[in-house]
Curated annotation (Swiss-Prot):
Signal peptide: none annotated. This is E3 ubiquitin-protein ligase makorin-3. GO terms for molecular function: identical protein binding; ubiquitin protein ligase activity; zinc ion binding. A zinc finger (RING-type) spans 347-401. Its EC number is 2.3.2.27.
Length: 544
């Protein structure tokens, strides 16, 4: 029985170490040596191989055997089963390091079924023979005895060993931080009796060698408790982690450790600049009855207006007031000069001084744009509205016979060209706000057409022009609007024509209405209707 079980026990002893490391994802210390396992370690499958005529061959446990061996303790000496307390005590789980403890997230603490001792792991990585000891800050841990591995385990393929990687890189891949690796190396060196200087030199040399072997390990993200762990090594072709400011890193550290967030310092709020008190309005207009007892400041006297309008504490207000006073003074001077020029002007028709007329409404000038002769507004309008002269004579100047298109009313006499142009522009802007009485909202006819200064506006709801018979509207409605007489107030005469023209217009209106009613049964063609409409429009535009 012992010979038959010896290979199986050897495989189990070798698979316990490989299975714990490959199945759990972390490295574990070698299992404790039992007497049966130690006795059977030296026994190999040589007798069987010699009997069959085969060369001696080392047997390496497969993945399935490793997994089974990692989940099953080695049998006791003599092939018998272990005692009940040893099987149910769960001591085999203490040989496996807790993966949550490696990441700093184990919630069980000292009650955890898995091992929290890191000294055995460090010795197995470094090949040291020192006995593991319990951590002072983690409480007492189960200590196991370690012996050198057998020849079969030592001659395992190099794929099972991670010594090809540098110490810092390999430890970082399995979850160790840089501080834990340094502390473990210092403790093991101190146990062997090295001095502090030798330890420092060795640590510096190891750090330089590891930095040369690990690609980008110095740019790795620092492990933060409570945040997803990313390891110590940076992938050679992976994306680089974004840089964080020290303030953000401190906030993350505070959040992971459960500490209160740092309260940001409030930004200093600028103090509002107090507005100066307004000036006393009574003192600015004349005299304040309160005098020095007034709650409001009294302004300084302005040289231009002579009032207490300058604020003693506000330089901007003083500058603005002086500028306004200068502009007002310039306007007053221009008005004074205009009045002085107009004082002795005599009308060329009535031969009276314009400013000395009895009726104040007649004290206005009628300025012609093309000449500089002086006329009062009433006389020049009477001259231009006379019918006993030809149109070219009545629209021209009575003295120089230079024709002018319009007369500009003004209270002051203007001679210079620039002032005349400014006066004409102001006159046109004022007239454009008034409705033309000849246009009559689209129902009349303005003889000036597009040259009229008054506003030609259609009633609300109409377009720019009334609906035409060929533009979508009914012809009867169009001609009814055109031929219907316009209702005006008494005293307003829209059409100045003779009695004969009124009678002709009335007869044409009646004839057109009758023709429109008989259009469906008449033999008029479309060309004749268009010709009739054209002749009527031309007649009305000439005689209205």
């Amino acid at each position: 029985m012992e010979e038959s079980t010896a290979p199986i026990e050897a495989h189990a002893a070798a698979g316990a170490e490989a299975g714990a490391e490959g199945g759990e994802g972390v490295s574990v210390p070698p299992p404790p040596q039992f007497e049966a396992a130690g006795a059977s370690a030296g026994v190999s499958s040589a007798p069987l191989q010699q009997a069959s005529g085969l060369a001696p061959l080392l047997v390496t446990p497969g993945p399935a055997i490793r997994r089974a061996a990692s989940l099953r303790p080695a049998p006791a000496e003599g092939g018998g089963a272990r005692s009940g307390p040893e099987r149910n005590s769960g001591s085999w789980t203490k040989q496996i390091l807790c993966r949550y403890y490696l990441h700093g997230q184990c919630k069980e603490g000292d009650n955890c079924r898995y091992s929290h001792d890191l000294s055995g792991r460090r010795r197995s990585r470094g090949g040291q023979d020192a006995q593991p000891r319990a951590s002072a800050d983690r409480g007492p841990k189960m200590a196991t005895r370690w012996e050198p591995p057998t020849q079969e385990v030592a001659e395992a393929p190099p794929a099972a060993s991670s010594s090809s990687l540098p110490l810092i890189g390999s430890a970082a891949e399995r979850g160790f931080t840089e501080a834990e690796i340094d502390n473990a190396g210092i403790r093991s060196a101190a146990e062997r009796g090295f001095s502090e200087a030798e330890i420092d030199n060795a640590s510096l040399a190891a750090g330089a060698a590891a930095g040369a072997g690990a690609e980008g390990w110095e740019g790795a993200i620092e492990f933060v408790p409570g945040q997803p762990y990313r390891g110590r090594m940076v992938p050679p072709h992976g994306p680089e982690a974004p840089l964080q400011s020290p303030a953000i890193e401190r906030e993350h550290m505070a959040m992971g450790m459960g500490m209160p967030m740092p309260v940001p310092m409030p930004m200093p709020v600028p103090m509002p600049v107090p507005m100066p008190l307004p000036l006393c309005r009574y003192a600015a207009r004349g005299q304040c009855l309160r005098g020095d007892r007034c709650a409001y400041p009294h302004g300084e006297i302005c040289d231009m207006c002579g009032q207490q309008a300058l604020h003693p504490w506000d330089a901007a207000q003083q500058e603005a007031h002086r500028r306004a006073c200068v502009e007002a003074h310039e306007r007053d001077m221009e008005l004074s000069f205009a009045v002085q020029r107009s004082m002795d002007k005599v009308c060329g028709i009535c031969m009276e001084v314009v400013y000395e007329k009895a009726d104040p409404s007649d004290r206005r000038f009628g300025i012609l744009f093309s000449c500089n002769h002086t006329y009062c507004l009433r006389c020049i309008r009477r001259w231009r509205s006379a019918t006993q002269f030809e149109n070219r004579i009545s629209k021209s100047c009575p003295q120089c016979r230079v024709s002018s298109g319009f007369v500009i009313p003004s209270e002051f006499w203007v001679e210079e060209e620039e002032e005349k142009e400014k006066l004409v522009q102001q006159y046109k802007e004022g007239m454009s706000q008034k409705a033309c009485r000849y246009f009559a909202g689209g129902l009349g006819h303005c003889p000036f057409g597009e040259f009229c200064f008054y506003k030609h506006e259609y009633p609300e709801g109409w377009r720019d022009q009334p609906p035409r018979p060929d533009g979508g509207g009914s012809s009867s409605a169009y001609w009814h609007q055109v031929l219907e007489p316009v209702q005006l107030r008494e005293g307003n005469v829209l059409f100045k024509s003779r009695k004969k023209e009124h009678s002709v217009l009335r007869l044409a209106n009646q004839l057109l209405k009758k023709l429109l009613c008989l259009r469906g049964s008449s033999s008029f063609s479309d060309d004749r209707w268009l010709l009739l409409q054209y002749q009527l429009e031309e007649y009305f535009s000439l005689n209205l």
